[in-house]
């Protein structure tokens, strides 16, 4: 049986393709590219010792790596302290489980504006293997795959490849993917392009959830983007 709703949607996108192309080019030409915030992109922090019985020999380091695109890089913030990584570190510092088992927090930020899943995968291949396994890798990806209209198959394969290299090369114990933002609501994207982009982002986000659910040690985090940048 033919899905008439799907056919109607495809036909609409075909008819509006010239409008999408014009609006996309105009956005690329007119949109101001915001700089990435200033600040350190790696560091080691001594944690308050909730468990004073931990000896120097037993003291371990909690290793955090934040990877991805402009959301991870902190675009829109003035400094890294105001950005995602700057807000995440104090939360981890005050976590009782981390305090009880670790003496230090070693963190690094590996993120660049405009990076797609392919760019992130390539970056992970180029980066040297860490001396110690990464306890948590937080990953933001998908916005630029959406705007570049990556195929569904390519997106799924590259997410699978990212998971594979993160676990194999970096020894990641917990990999957390942030959800894609609601791109249809972005004021910089005019109608009808916003609906097309929003629908594409929703498809990629659904696939991301499915891939995460199929792997041990991989989680999908629905993100409140308005709150994250406030």
Q: Where are the regions that the model predicts?
A:
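Short acidic/His/Gly/Ser-rich catalytic and metal-binding motifs that mark active-site loops
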Residues: 146, 184-188, 228-230
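A short helix->loop->beta-strand "cap" motif at the edges of active sites that frequently abuts
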Residues: 170-174
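N-terminal secretory targeting modules
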Residues: 1-64
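Substrate-gating cap/lid alpha-helix
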Residues: 185-222
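Alpha/beta-hydrolase-fold catalytic nucleophile elbow
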Residues: 140, 178-179
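Generic structural signal for well-ordered alpha-helices
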Residues: 159-164, 205
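Conserved SGNH/GDSL esterase-like catalytic core that processes O-acyl groups on lipids
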Residues: 63-65, 71-157
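Residue-level recognition of beta-strand->loop/alpha-helix junctions
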Residues: 109-111, 179, 222-224
């Amino acid at each position: 049986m033919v899905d008439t709703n799907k056919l109607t949607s495809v036909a609409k996108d075909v008819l509006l393709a010239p409008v999408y192309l014009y609006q996309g080019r105009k956005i690329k030409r007119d949109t101001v590219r915001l700089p990435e915030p200033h600040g350190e992109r790696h560091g080691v922090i001594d944690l308050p010792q909730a468990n004073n019985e931990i000896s120097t020999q037993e003291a371990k380091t909690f290793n955090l790596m934040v990877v991805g695109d402009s959301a991870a890089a902190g675009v829109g913030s003035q400094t890294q302290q105001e950005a995602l990584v700057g807000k995440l570190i104090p939360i981890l510092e005050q976590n009782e489980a981390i305090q009880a088992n670790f003496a230090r927090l070693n963190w690094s930020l590996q993120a660049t504006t405009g990076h797609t899943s392919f760019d992130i995968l390539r970056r992970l291949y180029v980066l040297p293997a860490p001396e110690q396994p990464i306890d948590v890798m937080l990953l933001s990806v998908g916005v630029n795959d959406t705007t570049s209209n990556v195929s569904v198959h390519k997106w799924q394969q590259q997410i699978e490849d990212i998971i594979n290299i993160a676990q194999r090369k970096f020894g990641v114990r917990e990999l957390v993917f942030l959800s894609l933002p609601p791109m249809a609501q972005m004021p910089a994207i005019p109608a009808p392009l916003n609906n097309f982009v929003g629908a594409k982002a929703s498809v990629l986000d659904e696939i991301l959830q499915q891939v995460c659910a199929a792997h041990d040690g991989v989680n999908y985090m629905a993100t409140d983007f308005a709150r994250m940048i406030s």
